Swiss-Prot record:
Pathway: Amine and polyamine biosynthesis; betaine biosynthesis via choline pathway; betaine from betaine aldehyde: step 1/1. GO terms for molecular function: betaine-aldehyde dehydrogenase (NAD+) activity; metal ion binding. Keywords: Metal-binding, NAD, NADP, Oxidation, Oxidoreductase, Potassium. The gene is betB. This is Betaine aldehyde dehydrogenase. The keyword Oxidoreductase applies. NAD(+) binds at G150, A151, W152, K176, P177, S178, E179, G230, V231, A232, S233, G254, C286, E387. The record marks E248 as: Seems to be a necessary countercharge to the potassium cations. Its cofactor is K(+). K(+) 2 binds at L246, K457, G460. Binds 2 potassium ions per subunit. Belongs to the aldehyde dehydrogenase family.
Amino acid sequence: MSRMAEQQLYIHGGYTSATSGRTFETINPANGNVLATVQAAGREDVDRAVKSAQQGQKIWAAMTAMERSRILRRAVDILRERNDELAKLETLDTGKAYSETSTVDIVTGADVLEYYAGLIPSLEGSQIPLRETSFVYTRREPLGVVAGIGAWNYPIQIALWKSAPALAAGNAMIFKPSEVTPLTALKLAEIYSEAGLPDGVFNVLPGVGAETGQYLTEHPGIAKVSFTGGVASGKKVMANSAASSLKEVTMELGGKSPLIVFDDADLDLAADIAMMANFFSSGQVCTNGTRVFVPAKCKAAFEQKILARVERIRAGDVFDPQTNFGPLVSFPHRDNVLRYIVKGKEEGARVLCGGDVLKGDGLDNGAWVAPTVFTDCSDEMTIVREEIFGPVMSILTYESEEEVIRRANDTDYGLAAGIVTADLNRAHRVIHQLEAGICWINTWGESPAEMPVGGYKHSGIGRENGVMTLQSYTQVKSIQVEMAKFQSIF
């Protein structure tokens, strides 16, 4: 693909040049080619976007629930019509296999938008009787202008997960995509405008997180920030949001999630789940189950089943329908993952497979890392304690249920957890003791629109998806009505 035209900001229904004068490049990690130069939003651009959003939000919030619902449903239709086009762009920018982006990224994002479009008329207040002459009623009102700050692993899906409930509740959103993968969020802005969203209700500001993101979190005109990313960055976002104007925040942060295989489990099922929990999207999924706990007596058999499945991984041309494994999103990220792999070897973990870059067959110029499985791991190892965000699985053994629950919870993270067992009593007993916000029994990874997702501990604050997220983009106003004559004590 030839280099794209320079990408601008999207403010008030159209493209506009950044005032900062700064740019950055976005690359295709499959081959290292530059896809486009992208303009970076500065402080003045954030001010412009907020003013635009304030204007648009008043128009949007004044529409009826059904009018807003119809516009968002039109956007859903356009997303589905353009699925292939958007998936190809997402593959170029992220490196993910087209077999994945064409069936997951836009599809699941559109589902979430459709879900919230349908929920708009359900945003209702309540009536509370006090006595014969007085009652209270409540209104759910939009927050106003909110900000979304996205991560690089699911660019358009995250933009939809954040914008759908915000817009459904009558807010305007300013969205900052990751500087690593900024392209499809700009296309989403075009689609919203085409669907009839008033100008300013969805503005997109590409830029560097430490600058553009910070300006958004500090801006007094923004009522809430929804952030997806790492724990350290999340803490900065939260601190800035609180220090500036006590903004509400939603944080979807990192994870080091446990997958527990019990001795009664079907090991073929367990191996299939472990593969998806570690190597889907080349391991760049925040909910990955990278700490795989297996009974000591099952370890050898489980390892053989994992090795057999690693042989089915097909890396190569990311647009080949048979490819199911792509490069990492960038060269700096690849190098960071490789440092973790070296650390795992140094600390005594045994490499079962992988452990290096992938080369040959057109892969030499890309950010490729081989699917890597470590075994003979222990809880104190760096690769077991820290989030790697790459195709690296750690196999650990255990002896008892009590032991594995304790060790599974021995982490600062609490995003996800899963178990594989044939015993439903055990399944529920154990899941109820795991300190994680998203849990799976005999499956892994699905996050449907109806399911609230978010973390415990350092893995986040608040939830995305589900009814409660729509409500979190509103504020409740209570109004008392008195029909009798008011009595003053003065």
